[in-house]
A protein has these predicted regions:
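Short, high-confidence coil segments that cap the C-terminus of an alpha-helix
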Residues: 80, 102-103, 202
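Pocket-flanking alpha-helical
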Residues: 91-122
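Conserved strand-loop elements at the edges of beta-sheets that form or border functional pockets
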Residues: 87
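Signal peptide-proximal N-terminal region
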Residues: 75-84
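Exported/periplasmic ABC-transporter solute-binding proteins
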Residues: 2-7, 11, 16-63, 68-72, ...
């Protein structure tokens, strides 16, 4: 696709891709070293003064549960505003932005993904951090205790694909410990890894701590020591092609506000 497409042309070209992944909030409710930014707005005051708008937020798959909660809270605090989410692996989100999919806000699970579309975004703001754990079946039937147990070839291990942030972090920590794992599959996002473990299709997998927490009735989480772990950072930014620039900036600012941070931290995310 030509890089000289007009904004309208870029939006038309990407509309079908985004539409297939959009998750209307109404149906759901009734490490890196990027500096903290503003996402295109100052964090003080802009969220409360936000104009009503229909916002489309492209968000990393690991934010699925918490963002549904956050979106409902934001809509309640901002009557007339509707927040619609499209959840996917960060690499898919970046592809959507590059292809001109119509959206207002982008939130990825690493800063490197955000950097790939820096020409299309405002200044990112780190809104949360996360860490990896080993997810196992309920009761940890295979007695997985630490990372080196994942090298057992009798164990069915599933990992996120190396193209996605969770896969990059997984490779980083396994390589650092000189542990060789032969996964039975590599999944397109971290939620797919979690699903494999939940369904018993895998004995163990590396997922974010918050993902394991969201499925604690179906999986156990084996903690990984900080010295062996990686810190995932979540940058949020407005998209320059947004037709709701002021409202988009206000939403990003709200994610860093006390109310937004409480929702994120209650779900197990760490302070930025």
């Amino acid at each position: 696709m030509s890089l000289t497409l007009t904004v309208a042309g870029r939006r038309a070209a990407g509309a079908a891709l985004t539409a297939a992944l959009l998750v209307p909030l109404a149906a759901c409710s009734s490490g890196d070293d990027t500096k903290k930014g503003t996402g295109g707005a100052t964090a003080s005051g802009s969220a409360s003064a936000a104009p009503a708008a229909d916002l489309t937020v492209l968000a990393a798959a690991s934010l699925t549960d918490v963002f549904k909660t956050a979106g409902a809270a934001y809509e309640k605090a901002h009557p007339g505003t509707k927040v619609t989410f499209s959840f996917a692996g960060s690499q898919e989100l970046v592809a959507q932005v590059s292809q001109g999919s119509p959206a207002d806000v982008l939130v990825t699970a690493d800063t490197k993904s955000m950097d790939k579309v820096k020409a299309d975004t405002g200044t990112p703001a780190i809104i949360a951090k996360n860490r990896l754990v080993i997810a196992t079946g309920e009761g940890n039937p295979h007695k997985v205790d630490d990372l080196k147990d994942l090298a057992d070839t009798k164990l069915k291990v599933v990992l996120a694909a190396p193209e996605v942030p969770a896969g990059k972090y997984s490779k980083q920590i396994l390589d650092a410990q000189k542990i060789t794992v032969k996964p039975v599959s590599q999944e397109p996002n971290v939620r797919a890894v979690l699903s494999k473990v939940e369904l018993g299709e895998a004995d163990a997998g590396l997922v974010y701590k918050t993902d394991a927490e969201s499925a604690k009735d179906k999986v156990d989480a084996v903690e990984i020591p900080d010295a062996q772990n990686a810190v995932a950072q979540y940058p949020a930014a407005t998209l320059k092609d947004s037709e709701n620039a002021e409202a988009a900036a206000a939403f990003v600012a709200w994610l860093s506000s006390p109310e937004g941070q409480k929702i994120l931290q209650d779900a197990g995310f760490q302070k930025p």
